[in-house]
Amino acid sequence: MEPSPAAGGLETTRLVSPRDRGGAGGSLRLKSLFTEPSEPLPEESKPVEMPFHHCHRDPLPPPGLTPERLHARRQLYAACAVCFVFMAGEVVGGYLAHSLAIMTDAAHLLADVGSMMGSLFSLWLSTRPATRTMTFGWHRSETLGALASVVSLWMVTGILLYLAFVRLLHSDYHIEGGAMLLTASIAVCANLLMAFVLHQAGPPHSHGSKGAEYAPLEEGPEEPLPLGNTSVRAAFVHVLGDLLQSFGVLAASILIYFKPQYKAADPISTFLFSICALGSTAPTLRDVLRILMEGTPRNVGFEPVRDTLLSVPGVRATHELHLWALTLTYHVASAHLAIDSTADPEAVLAEASSRLYSRFGFSSCTLQVEQYQPEMAQCLRCQEPPQA
């Protein structure tokens, strides 16, 4: 069957295999999906256009990165290069100045480099298709990279905290105020440059493609919720935190430069900035643990999803409802829908899938439709999970 010219933007897939051509189920399935008469299929089934409610939210994306992701990758490359160069400079400057505060700032930059490299690696992996072993693809590589970045920051910060404690106990150390002031000033400039690079606007988003990273809501009073590129946004917020820390180190270096007797400001600021650095990892660690523990996606509640499914005409009950996230923006849902005997399973499936996609922005939904049985009300496995 040749696809209709008006069916632009629909997903290309296979309807039936050659061995199903003679089956009545395949004919009924085709008849329920298309209104115009279909021509006999050739010996080998050809890919044809499928309507939205077949099973997927979006058309099959083109191979490679979208323009938005390409722009995000360029931003991350530039910011990562700047961050690495100035991190190396801070390590050298901190060593020459004998400043733990500078080293703490360099450790924070090290975490930034690791985070951005993990984001770049995940952007590259996201172009690889799913396999029979990795059926979900490689989406969680970004989560693992974020976890590695947090662990590395904790290790380096722990060492610096120990050294700062030793310095407070024993005052036999000397701070080179000039070298510390110069290094801290360069660090502030580096963070300003990285913030400028990451804050640059990307190309205009394209409609009808998931690469634009928009979570469409239902048409009505609410507007589409722009998500942007999560990796770039996270890096930008992280750089803003580094900028505040760099200003603090700069203030401590100015004090030590003009008042060398106040050299204790170096280990004291190391304590303060280490606490800030560890605290900044709390949101990332919370998101990582929630994803790895198969928790519900952030900003998606169990009750709203359940109520949305129960509001579909013909649905009497729902059970086995599971919501989880592969990444912060790739959300998945699965559920069993118990329907009335008079309800059309195809219509219920199409309507329920459409509501989940449009209202919550799920990337993948798997729904099983079954006849409602009275004993489901007493079945323990059909009950809702308790509130956490």
Swiss-Prot record:
The keyword Oxidoreductase does not apply. GO terms for cellular component: late endosome membrane; lysosomal membrane; neuron projection; plasma membrane; synaptic vesicle; synaptic vesicle membrane. Zn(2+) binds at H108, D112, H238, D242. InterPro entries: Cation_efflux, Cation_efflux_CTD_sf, Cation_efflux_TMD_sf, CDF/SLC30A. Keywords: Antiport, Cytoplasmic vesicle, Endosome, Ion transport, Lysosome, Membrane, Metal-binding, Synapse, Synaptosome, Transmembrane, Transmembrane helix, Transport, Zinc, Zinc transport. Residues 97-105, 167-177, 257-264 are lumenal. It comes from the Eukaryota. One of its GO terms (molecular function) is antiporter activity. Its main location: membrane. Residues 1-46 are annotated as: Disordered. Residues 1-75, 127-145, 199-235, 286-388 are cytoplasmic. The chain crosses the membrane at residues 76-96, 106-126, 146-166, 178-198, 236-256, 265-285. Homodimer. Homodimerization could regulate efficiency of zinc transport. Interacts with TMEM163. PANTHER family: CATION EFFLUX PROTEIN/ ZINC TRANSPORTER (PTHR11562), PROTON-COUPLED ZINC ANTIPORTER SLC30A3-RELATED (PTHR11562:SF30). Belongs to the cation diffusion facilitator (CDF) transporter (TC 2.A.4) family. SLC30A subfamily. Probable proton-coupled zinc ion antiporter mediating the import of zinc from cytoplasm into synaptic vesicles and participating to cellular zinc ion homeostasis in the brain. This is Probable proton-coupled zinc antiporter SLC30A3. It comes from Pongo abelii (Sumatran orangutan).
